[in-house]
Amino acid sequence: MMRWRNNQYKTQKQHKSDYSTAEKQDQDVLTGNIGYDLEHVKRKIGHNGDVHFRELEITQLHVKAALIFVEGLSDQDLINKGLSVLVMNQPNQVSDEISQSGKGILTSKQIKNQIVSIGDVIDSEKISDIVLNVFMGSTALLIDGIPQAFLLGTVKKQNRSIEEPLSEALVRGPRTGFTEELSTNTALLRQQGKNDQLTLQRFEVGTRLKKDLIIAYMNDIADPKVVEEVRKRVRGIEIDHLPESGYVEQLIEDNYLSPFPQVQSTERPDRVISGLMEGRVAILLDGTPFALIVPVTFSMMLQSPEDYYERWFPSSLIRLLRFIAAMITLFAPALYISFISFHPGLIPTKLAISISGTRQGVPFPSLIEALFMEVAIEILREAGLRLPKPIGPAIGIVGGLIIGEAAVQAGIVSPIMVIVVALTAISSFAIPHYSTGIALRMLRFGAMFCAAVFGLFGVIMYYLLLSSHVVKLKSFGVPYASPAVPYHLKDWKDFVIRMPLLVMKRRPKMMNTDNTKRVK
């Protein structure tokens, strides 16, 4: 008996739930009664003062209509021009075909052809679609007797002009950079060259505040498995809002615990196109000038577009300098600590005597000395970034000089320590990719602690630990340490040394591209 009652209760509860769901679905659908529909839309939108409801009438047909748009998001001039029959109250522009056909009854086709002169028009019967599109800048047109709304593309373009990227300045190369407007960025990609294989696939991301996202790839070059993996990860993004592409980067990367960036960010359209021509995939998000490129390797983070715009010999030397600068950034303070504290015998005698003389009177061990200067430099660097542009760089340079000189005169640090820290800071600026530079700067503190505890052996152990991590790391299935591990001899033509373009006839083997030949 009790089981029967429980089953009956569950059945009644299920019927109530189904009825409630059906009722909600009915409430989300337009009825064609403009007064009733407007009340439902207003209730759905809530108390938003920037949303305008403009009730009008097509006087020649005696049909009521209404416009719904957001002030500032919708282009008023475009609304006035595209809906001049309604907005400007010009009934004489309604053709006789409409006024005579169907005894004054408008059809969807007639509205699009005779009343609306805006090209981008979408039909929808759902109130939720109306609210969503209105808050994205569209204008909703409701007409009495028609149980559907016409969503007009009246988004007001508020983008800045195309400028040179601030974070990737070049001596030689294009001066164009991405903007915050997605349509402008896709146009910049198209303008890089005529090619019918450039594919731009659009997605919608964000569970509450929705944004457009585009993945770009060369259809005849990119590995289909990589493209499908990018699609899968983009579809798997479930977050309220994506204000910047950095959110996308953190949500799609392979190992979120790794200090190394596994996605390359760039403001340069030429760099994106170069990546696409190698078989990579680009991700562009509306509202940010930074595009993402996947898959990537560690060596890519030390490369600059200018490497390919200059001749191969100077480009190779400069690239080699960047690799050396990366090692200096990571290990210079640690090597100083290990040599001073554990292995002074490895230093040449004259240099050891000179260093010993400069350290007389310094009350702190080499680790504390190095930490003090490194932290001071990082604070100055951060302060220089946050201060206004006219005074930011000056504060960083002058502040570093003053603090270094004052610390030496006070006997807190030695002059050789100031030289080491300055060399480390300058070397970090030679790294083209900002996120990689930050990673190396933070990782050097770990190397310093290992050097303070175990000396040179600690530095070697730390290097092996980082190397093993980099070797295990992957970016969308591509080994992060390629082409060193796994070993691809042909890809070494564009590794530490950049060989002449006539020698680099094929695309990177690690990308597993369908079309491998790029120079005939």
From Swiss-Prot:
Q: Could you confirm whether the keyword Lipid biosynthesis appears in this record? A: no
Q: What are the annotated GO cellular component locations?
A: plasma membrane
Signal peptide coordinates: none
Q: Where are the transmembrane segments?
A: 281-301, 323-343, 390-410, 411-431, 445-465
Q: Name one Pfam family in it.
A: GerA
- Membrane topology per record: Multi-pass membrane protein
The UniProt keyword set, sorted, is: Cell membrane, Membrane, Transmembrane, Transmembrane helix
Top-level lineage group: Bacteria
- Record carries keyword Zinc: no
Localization per record: Cell membrane
Composition bias, kind Polar residues: at what positions? 1-11
* Disulfide links within the chain: none
What residue spans carry the Basic and acidic residues bias annotation?
A: 15-24
What processes in GO biological process is this protein linked to? spore germination
Q: What is its main location?
A: membrane
Q: Region (Disordered): which ranges? A: 1-24
Q: Which InterPro entries match?
A: Spore_Ger, UPF0353/GerABKA_families
Please state which protein family the record places this protein in: Belongs to the GerABKA family.
Q: Which PANTHER family match?
A: LEUCINE ZIPPER PROTEIN 4 (PTHR22550:SF5), SPORE GERMINATION PROTEIN (PTHR22550)
Designated name of the protein = Uncharacterized membrane protein YndD
Give the organism, scientific name: Bacillus subtilis (strain 168)
Give me the gene this protein comes from.
yndD
